[in-house]
């Protein structure tokens, strides 16, 4: 592909070239001044370049300056003397030797004895505390059964030799847990009472329904018990009527049978 003339004019070409150089330098270095960087590299590798253009640089071009040297690191302040070095002669011996020697020189026999007694008392107190802690942490913590016992333990005076046992928390946490447990118990009791009231009302309504329906059922049962009696009576009546009919038919037949005999007798008598 053949080269073609650029589209931009001279100022546009220069701007694009400057921007390309700036971006290429920014891609590999972060100093922010690629002109000074190029001048430094040119002086290091002995590349002086061609002669300057005639007439000097165009007006408005920035003057190329050499990069400034980095400021020197601040000097470290002198180290302060260690506490107890013994003043001016602290460097002569180990730390703490001069001060302890001066303090021992100023203390008397009685003061030294008091100091030793205080050290022994502190050691004994620390041993007692460690023993009490070991004794308390060996066994499980004592449970709290009632609210009064919990209040008495929380309001009791603080024991300097005491310590917290395992599986126990602070007073605020225990109080919060206790209040949560109380609220849960209260809610369950309310639910139980509500269910009990509902059950009682249901039983009362059921009894009322049964009491209201019982006379109706008794009346219906009475009616059901009377029906077979009425049927038997009707049957008896039917039977009685049929017997009456048979008796009447029998009497009529007997009368009819007796009438010709009478007639025959009468005829015989007449002859």
Curated annotation (Swiss-Prot):
Residues 49-103, 124-146, 203-271 are annotated as: Disordered. The keyword Phosphoprotein applies. Residues 87-99 have a biased composition (Gly residues). This is Probable protein VP2. Residues 50-61 have a biased composition (Pro residues). Phosphorylated at C-terminal serines. It holds the Pfam family TT_ORF2-like. Residues 207-216 have a biased composition (Basic and acidic residues).
């Amino acid at each position: 592909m053949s080269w073609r003339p650029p589209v931009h004019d001279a100022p546009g070409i220069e701007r694009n070239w400057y921007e390309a150089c700036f971006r290429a330098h920014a891609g590999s270095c972060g100093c922010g001044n690629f002109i000074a960087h190029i001048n430094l590299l040119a002086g290091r590798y002995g590349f002086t370049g061609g002669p300057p253009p005639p007439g000097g640089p165009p007006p408005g071009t920035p003057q190329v300056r050499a990069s400034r040297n980095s400021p020197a690191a601040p000097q470290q302040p002198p180290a302060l003397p260690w506490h107890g070095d013994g003043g001016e002669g602290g460097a002569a011996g180990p730390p703490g030797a001069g001060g302890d020697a001066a303090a021992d020189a100023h203390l008397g026999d009685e003061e030294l004895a008091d100091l030793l007694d205080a050290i022994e008392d502190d050691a004994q107190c620390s041993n007692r505390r460690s023993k009490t802690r070991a004794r308390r942490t060996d066994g499980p913590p004592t449970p709290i059964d009632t609210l009064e016992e919990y209040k008495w333990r929380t309001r009791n005076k603080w024991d300097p030799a005491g310590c917290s046992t395992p599986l126990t928390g602070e007073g605020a946490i225990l109080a919060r847990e206790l209040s949560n447990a109380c609220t849960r118990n209260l809610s369950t009791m309310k639910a139980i009472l509500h269910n009990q009231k509902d059950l009682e009302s249901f039983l009362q309504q059921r009894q009322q329904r049964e009491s209201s329906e019982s006379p109706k059922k008794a009346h219906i049962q009475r009616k059901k018990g009377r029906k077979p009696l009425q049927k038997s009576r009707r049957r008896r009546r039917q039977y009685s009527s049929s017997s009456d009919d048979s008796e009447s038919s029998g009497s009529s037949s007997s009368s009819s049978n007796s009438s010709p005999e009478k007639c025959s007798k009468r005829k015989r008598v007449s002859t």
